[in-house]
Amino acid sequence: MAEEKSFPMTADGKAKLEQELEDLRLVRRPEVINRIKIARSYGDLSENSEYESAKDEQAFVEGRISQIETMLQYAVIIDNEDVAADEVSMGREITFQELPDEEPESYTIVGESESDPLSGKISNESPMAKGLLGHKVGDTVEIEIPNGSMKVKILSVK
């Protein structure tokens, strides 16, 4: 039997997925079903672009529902209770400086499903996060990134 993948995430990330799932089930799914019903009333389905569009959206909505259900079923909520306060771990905001003298940057390391780099949330699967995880404030770390490597100093962990 194949081993199921776990989905590490913060409690906030899990709550957002649960909210999205509820919205998909209670709002989007009924809207799409209604669109399909209306499009069917137009007659010939072979050349009915409204029907095709609604069916495509239905496939997307049902696929996303299935994806979220799986992620929630195998969710592992990150608990930093047993991790030192100055250690980089998921769910924490990390401030680091690329050496020798770049401006400090801050990111929160989150599960893959919560990742949003433009909002300062990077996936625990990203090269940056993988390189930082487990290190402590004051450590200088060499991180392998797609176009080479970079050296950073960890300034703070919150």
Swiss-Prot record:
- Residues annotated as coiled-coil are 49-69
Q: Where is this region: Disordered?
A: 102-125
Lyase is among the record's keywords = no
Gene Ontology terms, MF aspect: DNA binding; RNA polymerase binding
Note the superkingdom of the native organism: Bacteria
**Which UniProt key words apply to this protein?**
Coiled coil, DNA-binding, Transcription, Transcription regulation
Answer yes or no on keyword Cell division.
no
Pfam families under this entry? Answer: GreA_GreB, GreA_GreB_N
Q: What does this protein do?
A: Necessary for efficient RNA polymerase transcription elongation past template-encoded arresting sites. The arresting sites in DNA have the property of trapping a certain fraction of elongating RNA polymerases that pass through, resulting in locked ternary complexes. Cleavage of the nascent transcript by cleavage factors such as GreA or GreB allows the resumption of elongation from the new 3'terminus. GreA releases sequences of 2 to 3 nucleotides.
Which protein family is it in?
A: Belongs to the GreA/GreB family.
UniProt-recorded name of the protein: Transcription elongation factor GreA
Q: Which gene encodes it?
A: greA
